[in-house]
């Protein structure tokens, strides 16, 4: 699927890793953060990837003499494409770019339509348009961000057509903007906080709102933000070690500058690439995404991922002077100094804390993508491990001391964290097995006993082991949530029974019926 060809363009090891990250992002949800020094080929990677992918465009044209004819043409086009007429008039339909032209007194309406999103585009011939189909490389929007840039420089802006002489409402000029490009790279995005905040919303919602015009719902294939490493040379960039808010990006890839010979080889290959036809089309990406989504994950690998997430999202902060915390909480919700905690020796969250939800979802997505790119039918433990290296570094709140222990390298810190996780799994194997079995059976009593909350059982030594306490506590929370759902379900059934009774019963029976329902 062109993955090998794309990887072969870049000779450096970190470029190979980043290439896999980009392709994995492309066949999942398209949100990637690239971290690397200048000259690491970050921009070149995005341009090269977009040039390998093509799509078929239907270029529909129609001449007109007045506004009425434009209105009729767009109305018939909107009906044929199955899109909202007002959005089409304002150029707010993704996959369609509208232009007006006036050459030698001949006025022309042009619709450039991506057939991957609008399969009915060739049928505009039936509406009086002349339609020409052509295969094009996918466009990319690559911009080096500066602190003074305005958001409008990136999202496009409303314009009034000169051809229609003000007789027509404004429409969006979006050709050279993120509202139109399927591949986007904003290099050094974080030097402009206002733009970064706007892009934060765009990455998640895939929407851009234009005051007085409307909203366009985009569907980019890949959104990449690039930033430099955190050191004295790049003071304006975010401190990735403590930027848990960056977890909107599914994948983070670290890219270093290759050796001089690799640089020359890569430049030569990129020059040749300009004359190489695209290798895959846009619909292939959509098909791959569907296959990746359906791919299963090996049970043992998924279970270990859940155990890791549980221990990284649990805090039992307690000091020798205070009563020990019985139930865990999110490390992000309390102010604490881990070095003072009595549980610090068996707590993994002291090294790196992560919010479970996006971490687990992202690792599963990326593990499936990594397995797919390797030609597998299911994601295995090695795929989950590879995904963790893409998903955890930018998402965790790291201990500064732990980062320094690992030479200031976040990737090494991930290795150290996983080594400690594996060590605790082996050391407390029987206790972990007990928690897992109790969780699967819904055995709340055993979980309470492990946590020291069962008044009918003696305190266990394992109750002082934060690693096991975290697993038991998270399992108990899931059991509690299940019980609450069951109770809510029963309450809903009661309410429905009461409603039906009151609708059908006579006045004399009403009070008795309500009392019966309460019981």
Where are these regions (language model features)?
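C-terminal engagement/docking regions of AAA+ P-loop ATPases
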Residues: 38-44, 331-519
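Canonical AAA+ ATPase core
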Residues: 53, 57, 162-164, 183-196, ...
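Helical mechanochemical/support elements of P-loop NTPase systems and associated helical scaffolds
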Residues: 14-18, 45, 146-151, 191-196, ...
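Conserved C-terminal "switch" segment of AAA+ ATPases
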Residues: 10-12, 252-341, 376-377
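Walker A/P-loop
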Residues: 24-146
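Conserved alpha-helical scaffold flanking the Walker A/P-loop in AAA+ ATPase domains
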Residues: 21-25, 124, 128, 158-184
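Pre-Walker A (pre-P-loop) alpha-helix and adjacent loop at the N terminus of AAA/AAA+ ATPase modules
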Residues: 2-40
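Conserved RecA-like P-loop NTPase ATPase core
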Residues: 22, 34, 154, 187, ...
